[in-house]
Design a protein with these regions (language model features):
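Cytosolic-side transmembrane-helix boundaries in multi-pass membrane proteins
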Residues: 1-15, 181-198, 216, 265-302
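Membrane-interfacial amphipathic/re-entrant helices at transmembrane-helix boundaries
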Residues: 1-36, 65, 73-80, 149, ...
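Extracellular/periplasmic helix-loop junction at the C-terminal end of a transmembrane helix
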Residues: 114-145, 175, 270, 291-297
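Transmembrane alpha-helical segments in multi-pass inner-membrane proteins
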Residues: 81, 92, 203-291
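Helix-loop-helix "hairpin" substructures at the membrane interface of multi-pass membrane proteins
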Residues: 146-225
Length: 302
């Protein structure tokens, strides 16, 4: 059987918006940023089995860091990017240090509460800094990337680099340990491994990637809004990861592209686009559930 040339297919799909230009190219640029955020959640689930509703704090927080530092001078992106990553890592470590003591629904609710805390602080706590309900506008792009095509291509290259590192990480000794942790945490603990330490590491890496996506979204749109920090944004990122299959390396990217372009297409034809989008998500969830059950009952190979 011939191997499918996935690299060539991905390259062609990635370059297609350049030929279309205009609105499709802007949508593609936005999809790249959301893909990074969705990939951060897919990575967390793939390596630890954890599900978070707090990633909007990292995603939107990265966007706000970029906005606050670059509104006056785009050359400050050299400082905004590492500080946004620092925000993603430190806030994830703080949340993980508290949250990883709990499991299941308790962990999920704690992450949601954290995101809402950051959301309220940005919206009402420091309106003179964050812009309050109005957010912040006039965010420039990095020098040399002012054009949409250049910004999109750079973001696409960054996303592909992230996915390549993600794939390499899974095959590394550390990635194999995390995979074993996801499959049987108690057995790993019984063998003397500090599983909480490894979970915290995965959570920190996930937070950094989400913050990177937020930085890229701020430059793409030119504004940030408190909604970027709300738990609904976490839910949107999670839905993207699930639509893409959540376990494959490309899950977050695929889900982001599908939802961004599907939403844009439906909203262009009907005011009821949310209804049709919801129906699509229900069908996607049912298909995933059926596929999962089929995999459970499939006979194992010799």
């Amino acid at each position: 059987m011939k191997r499918v040339p996935w690299a060539g297919i991905i390259l062609l799909l990635g370059l297609a918006p350049l030929a279309l230009g205009g609105y499709p190219l802007r949508l593609a640029g936005e999809a790249v940023a959301w893909a990074m955020g969705a990939t951060s959640l897919a990575f967390l689930y793939r390596t630890t089995g954890l599900v978070s509703l707090g990633h909007a704090a990292f995603f939107g927080g990265g966007a706000y860091v970029a906005a606050l530092l670059t509104r006056g001078d785009p050359s400050y992106y050299f400082l905004a990017l590492p500080l946004a990553l620092f925000w993603g890592i430190t806030s994830a470590v703080a949340l993980g240090w508290l949250g990883l003591r709990s499991h299941g629904i308790y962990f999920l609710m704690l992450t949601l509460a954290f995101a809402q805390l950051i959301y309220v602080l940005a919206k009402q706590g420091f309106p003179g800094i964050t812009g309050g309900d109005d957010g912040l506008t006039g965010i420039p792009r990095p020098p040399g990337l002012e054009g949409q095509a250049a910004y999109y291509l750079t973001g696409l290259g960054l996303l592909l680099g992230v996915l390549a590192l993600y794939r390499a990480f899974l095959a590394s000794p550390l990635g194999l340990v995390l995979d074993a942790l996801r499959l049987n945490e108690r057995r790993l603990e019984a063998l003397g491994w500090d599983v909480r330490h490894y979970k915290l590491l995965a959570f920190a890496l996930s937070g950094a990637l989400a913050a990177l996506g937020g930085v890229w979204l701020a430059g793409q749109r030119g504004f940030v809004h408190p909604h970027d920090l709300a738990w609904t944004t976490s839910g949107q990122l999670l839905v993207m990861a699930v639509v893409g299959g959540i376990r494959p390396v490309y899950a977050g990217a695929l889900g982001a592209v599908v939802l961004i372009f599907l939403e844009a297409t439906l909203s262009a034809y009907t005011n009821l686009w949310n209804l049709f989008l919801g129906i699509f998500l229900m069908i996607a969830a049912l298909l995933r559930l059926r596929r999962g059950k089929g995999a459970e009952h499939a006979p194992s190979g010799a």
